[in-house]
Swiss-Prot record:
Primary role: Component of the extracellular signaling pathway that establishes the dorsal-ventral pathway of the embryo. A protease cascade involving ndl, gd, snk and ea results in activation of the spz Toll receptor ligand; acts downstream of ndl and gd. Activation of ea requires both activation of the ndl-gd-snk protease cascade and sulfation of a vitelline membrane component by pip. Localized activation of the Toll receptor in the ventral region of the embryo defines cell identities along the dorsal-ventral continuum.
Span of domain Clip: 92-138
InterPro entries, A to Z: CLIP, CLIP_Serine_Protease, Peptidase_S1_PA, Peptidase_S1_PA_chymotrypsin, Peptidase_S1A, Trypsin_dom, TRYPSIN_HIS, TRYPSIN_SER
Organism of provenance: Drosophila melanogaster (Fruit fly)
Locations listed in the record: Secreted
Residues carrying a glycan: N255
First-level EC class: hydrolase
A single BP term in Gene Ontology: dorsal/ventral axis specification
Pfam families, alphabetized: Trypsin
Name listed for the protein in its UniProt record: Serine protease snk
UniProt domain Peptidase S1: residue ranges: 186-432
Length: 435
């Protein structure tokens, strides 16, 4: 057994050593695109056009001037690795030695980890292999990650812009690294922290003349994903007597006006082509606004989750929905922590749901608190549910859209959410088509 294990480790180190010694990135990229046809995790065309993308902050010239040198070690180098069991390419991961969260990508797509090894001897965590190429755990906050899709690149742009915003009322620059607690949706929830959800949108239905704020009825939620588009649930546009016609951004109190809020009319509603109002499937839509949003500290687009699976224990929902079943709606934006329910449990709970003839599908997931007491509720539909990662103190990644549930916060009745990753290609084709 010891001999076999030694042989396995030797082969892994040999593979990693070979790939890190390979200077021909173009040849590797060609192999990358061809072989991704046989994997669950796919690389879009935009990855071919961006040889190096940055996460979080600008990369200075010193960090990028010699990328090929980070692809190889010295001839006598011994690569320190650890093997993670059961992780596939594209999976969420945590490094064994420091607990940093990341995702599993090919070794040559995470140059910063390679440089860390060469300079500091930092351990490399191997998730799996593809065609003898090591797939390693690459921290989400690393600056050197090759080939990102457009929504990931836009996330970086939006947050870099937010850090550079000059707040004229205070004369300082917004760092984006700390969220300021707010004052005291969601059943069992708490008020949101200021700056944590600048992408939150409230959908409105104009009543009468619509000349006054009282003439707008606020219902569903949504998430700003670009300068012109808001993401929401398809049923929010089809379940009433008329569709929503207004979006409010930058508001934390719906019953109060503020200098930060922006009210913008809806120009076009784009339902997912497979959505049918008679079923709960493909419950997702994009709202095109009549004008571009003005970005500020309080208003900027969301970051969209880039991985096929969540593999995180909890998510955070936000909205202005009811604070109890059939109770009054909340005027204050609130948030609640929810447990991600195992997919098999989710399928079992909703196996007899009339509007789910095929049961829970891959494009859906459940979240809640099975003992009861915490949940999204009426009025939260269409609002985003988020992953909060320690590396990004003030950035919430949208992982899903609130779709439906049995009751609010009842035991063994988690809410059902549209899984964002399943529709990421569709979102990008519409919201970022000018790019």
């Amino acid at each position: 057994m010891i001999i076999l294990w030694s042989l396995i480790v030797h082969l892994q180190l040999t593979c990693l050593h070979l790939i890190l010694q390979t200077p021909n990135l173009e040849a590797l990229d060609a192999l990358e695109i061809i072989n991704y046809q046989t994997t669950k995790y796919t690389i879009p065309e935009v990855w071919k056009e961006q040889p190096v993308a940055t996460i979080g902050e600008d990369v200075d010239d010193q960090d990028t001037e010699d990328e090929e040198s980070y692809l190889k070690f010295g001839d006598d180098a011994e690569v320190r690795t650890s093997v993670s069991e059961g992780l596939h390419e594209g999976a969420f991961c945590r490094r064994s030695f420091d607990g940093r969260s990341g995702y599993c990508i090919l070794a040559y797509q995470c140059l910063h980890v390679i440089r860390e090894y060469r300079v500091h001897g930092t351990r490399i965590d191997i998730c799996t292999h593809r065609n003898n190429v090591p797939v390693i755990c690459c921290p989400l906050a690393d600056k050197h990650v090759l080939a990102q899709r457009i929504s990931a690149t836009k996330c970086q742009e939006y947050n870099a812009a937010a850090r550079r915003l000059h707040l004229t009322d205070t004369g300082r620059t917004f760092s984006g690294k700390q969220c300021v607690p707010s004052v005291p949706l969601i059943v069992g929830g708490t008020p949101t922290r200021h700056g944590l959800f600048p992408h939150m949108a409230a959908l409105g239905w104009t009543q009468g003349s619509g000349s006054k704020d009282q003439d707008i009825k606020w219902g569903c939620g949504g998430a700003l994903v670009s300068e012109l588009y808001v993401l929401t649930a398809a049923h929010c546009a089809t379940s009433g007597s008329k569709p929503p016609d207004m979006v409010r951004l930058g508001a934390r109190q719906l019953n109060e006006t503020s200098a930060t809020q922006q009210d913008i009319k809806i120009l076009i509603i784009v339902l997912h082509p497979k959505y049918r109002s008679s079923a709960y499937y493909h419950d997702i839509a994009l709202l095109k606004l009549t004008r571009r949003v003005k970005f500020s500290e309080q208003v900027r687009p969301a970051c969209l989750w880039q991985l096929p699976e969540l593999q995180i224990p909890t998510v955070v929902a936000a909205g202005w929905g009811r604070t109890e079943f059939l109770g009054a709606k909340s005027n204050a934006l609130r948030q609640v922590d929810l447990d991600v329910v195992p997919q098999m449990t989710c399928k079992q709970i909703y196996r007899k749901e009339r509007r789910l003839p095929r049961g829970i599908i891959e494009g859906q997931f459940c979240a809640g608190y099975l003992p009861g007491g915490r949940d999204t509720c009426q009025g939260d539909s269409g609002g985003p549910i988020h992953a909060l990662l320690p590396e990004y103190n003030c950035v919430a990644f949208v992982v899903g859209i609130t779709s439906f549930g049995k009751f609010c916060a009842a035991p063994n009745a988690p809410g059902v959410y549209t899984r964002l990753y399943s529709y990421l290609d569709w979102i990008e084709k519409i919201a970022f088509k000018q790019h």
